[in-house]
Each structure stands twice: as C-alpha cells, then as structure tokens.
Amino acid sequence: MLLRAAWRRAAVAVTAAPGPKPAAPTRGLRLRVGDRAPQSAVPADTAAAPEVGPVLRPLYMDVQATTPLDPRVLDAMLPYLINYYGNPHSRTHAYGWESEAAMERARQQVASLIGADPREIIFTSGATESNNIAIKGVARFYRSRKKHLITTQTEHKCVLDSCRSLEAEGFQVTYLPVQKSGIIDLKELEAAIQPDTSLVSVMTVNNEIGVKQPIAEIGRICSSRKVYFHTDAAQAVGKIPLDVNDMKIDLMSISGHKIYGPKGVGAIYIRRRPRVRVEALQSGGGQERGMRSGTVPTPLVVGLGAACEVAQQEMEYDHKRISKLSERLIQNIMKSLPDVVMNGDPKHHYPGCINLSFAYVEGESLLMALKDVALSSGSACTSASLEPSYVLRAIGTDEDLAHSSIRFGIGRFTTEEEVDYTVEKCIQHVKRLREMSPLWEMVQDGIDLKSIKWTQH
C-alpha cells in the first residue's frame, strides 16, 4: 500500500510540475494534404527548430505495409495498458486471472473470424514469426520421413528465406512458378507433390499485386495427397471470407497490424484434428501449448482480438466500399494516361491492393514526385532495394515496367477525396516525367524501342 501511495504521489507531482501545457491528444484526427501537423505530432527537436517550418502529413495509401490502429481497437486495449497489467500466466491472484480471461476472449475472437476452434490459435509476434513456426516447425518435426516442401516464387520474403534456411539443413524445396496472372497452375502443384512432401505453403493474397490464389482448391489437393497446407493470410484475414475447415487449411499465419490492430502481435492457426505436429522454435516457459514460449502481451492480443471482431462485423461493407474506390482509381488513371499496365489478374484480385506500371517513367522518380501521398513501389520488407520486384519478374513483367510500378493501397479509412487527389497528382506527375523522357519522345515519334541497338560507352 505504501508503495502504491508513493507511486500515486509521484504521478501527481509529475502532472503538476511546471512547464508547457501538453497538447490535446490527436487520436481520431484525420490529417489531409496541406494541413499542419498538430504540435503534439511534431518531434520535440523539430518543433523547437524554426527553420524547419510546417510539417505536412501526406495522404496514406500504403495499407499493405501497415494499417492505422482502429480507434475501437485502441479503446479495447487501453484498460490492459493501464489498469489490468497482470501476467496472464500468473494463476494465483486476480491480476493474472483478469489478463488470462482477456487473452482467452481474444483467442475466441481470432478463431471466430476464420472458423477455427480457439484451442487452435497460438499467439505470436506477427506473421513473420508465424510463417517461421509453420514452415520450419512442420519440416523439422517430420524430417525423419519427409524432407520435401513446396512453395511459390512469389511468396513473402520471410517464407522464401525460411525455405532457403531449410535447404541449408538438407531439405529439398520446390519453388513453383506462377502464370502471368500471378496464379499458380494447379496441375503443376499436383505434379510437384512427392511421397516425402510434408508441407505446401501458398499465400492467400499477394502483398505486392493483390492476386488471390485458389486456396480452397489447393487445400483439397493437399488433403487428398495427405500433405499439410499452410497459407500466409496476413493480407487476407479480415478482408475476404476465410474458413479453415471449408478450405482444408492446416496452418494459417495472421498479422495484427495488417487488420487495423497493433504492431508486434499476430497468430498462427494450427489444426488439432487431424493434429498437425510442430517443433517449437524457441525454448522457455512452455506458454501457448509449448509452441511459442514467452509471456503473452495482454494489451496486444486484446487489440488483435478486437481488430478481428471489428473486421468480422464490417468485412462485407468494407469490401464493397474499397471495391468502388479501387475501380474509381484504376478507371480514372487509365482513361487519362496511355501505356499503364495493371499487374496481376484483375478478376482474382483483392481490390484494396492495386499495382500499376507506368511505362517510360521510373518508379522511384514518381514516388519522389508524389511526396504528398504515402505510396510504395512494392513490399515494405524489400522496398529499400533498387532491384525490380521479384514478384513482378516472376509474372513475366519486363524489367522496364517492373521498375515503373507503384502499389496503391486502399483501406477502411481511405476516402473518395483522397483517391481523387491521388489520381490527379499521379496523372500530373506521370505526364511531367514522360515529357522529360527521351524514350517517351521516341515512342511518340513512332520509333520501335526494341529495334534500337544500344551501345555502351
């Protein structure tokens, strides 16, 4: 009691200490291009430097990289950041019981979204860890009998790197090519399965081009051949309907910050019946049924659960709205600009992820010109590289077009005005950059660029 009283006095003292009055919280504030960032949103050193000037907040159109935290999710998390701070694994007092109850409620919310049993949900730090557990965990557990895995050339980097790591351990991995649409050939998948294949890993929605793989068909093939099926559903959960039983999915990776939840938390679904055995990657206290040791962060899993519940309630509405905005963006850009290519299959496609290539324009130059809009040229995990996207190369995109691609992300909080502004600025800067391009000038003069023999100096 004395310690608690002292803590309260210290908190009051800090609150009452003289100094500048703190700025009002900015939660829920939508900033648009041209707005000045609130003083509380400016770093202290920037705010103190008069030569820096006003700070502009660009429009956010990069929801494949991450999504903003839904205010309803934050409301659910706050009590577990402030009052209910017990360790959910401490089962001898009320603090632990409160946190454990919240953790299990979140587990139920995640399971409900994908049609799973709550006991099949294991909390992790995010989709990268979930993918590592699924791929390495299954491969290593069954290594005595099965040493072959199958994945695709367009998977997320953490899946590809996990497979390469297993190859260094002596496993054999088949990397299936994709068609120009970005979708795998199911006949090639069937032909690739061997008697010693333990796992097939195919992502649900591609993070760069938004293509949806035929997950239910893949699940049926794997089930009939008695091979476990894992899907990285980070870009799909909460955005399109998924049912792990109907689709015969054995393992699924989920990310919190891709569905308007907090960063640093995710989950992996691991089927119980028939049971999928996984070798744990880390040692410790045996939390999460021994599959993922470490104290579960209650506020984060509460946020993940709340995000899943909101997504389940609003999925149909969000999808219709995002589809309309996506159609608006694509049509308005393509009717105003020639030589624009949409990458990936337009029919089997999640509408919130649009990847366009603007011929005769360098993607990095266009990104720099569109400084008022937060966009990406591809995956946030590989966008620091100047190499063309391996996903675009895999679908047969010419290197020049691959270098000219921009990914537009439309999400729950994207407005029609933001889409129109992005379209307007995109058209303006593509036209300006093309006017500066000698290649564009040659094309306008009717010269076939492929007929030119370039020489090095």
From Swiss-Prot:
N6-(pyridoxal phosphate)lysine PTM positions read 258
Q: In which tissues is it expressed?
A: Predominantly expressed in heart and skeletal muscle. Also found in brain, liver and pancreas.
After translation, the protein is modified as follows: N-gluconoylated. Cysteine persulfide intermediate is reduced by thiol-containing molecules like glutathione and L-cysteine. Persulfide reduction is a rate-limiting step of cysteine desulfurase catalytic cycle.
Describe activity versus temperature.
Answer: Optimum temperature is 46 degrees Celsius.
EC number(s) given by UniProt: 2.8.1.7
Indicate which residues the UniProt annotation says bind [2Fe-2S] cluster: 381
Chain residues that bind pyridoxal 5'-phosphate: 127-128, 235, 255, 257, 295
- Recorded GO MF terms: cysteine desulfurase activity; iron-sulfur cluster binding; metal ion binding; protein homodimerization activity; pyridoxal phosphate binding; sulfur carrier activity
Question: What is this protein's pH dependence?
Answer: Optimum pH is 8.
Question: What name goes with this protein?
Answer: Cysteine desulfurase
Report the source organism. Homo sapiens (Human)
Gene of this entry: NFS1
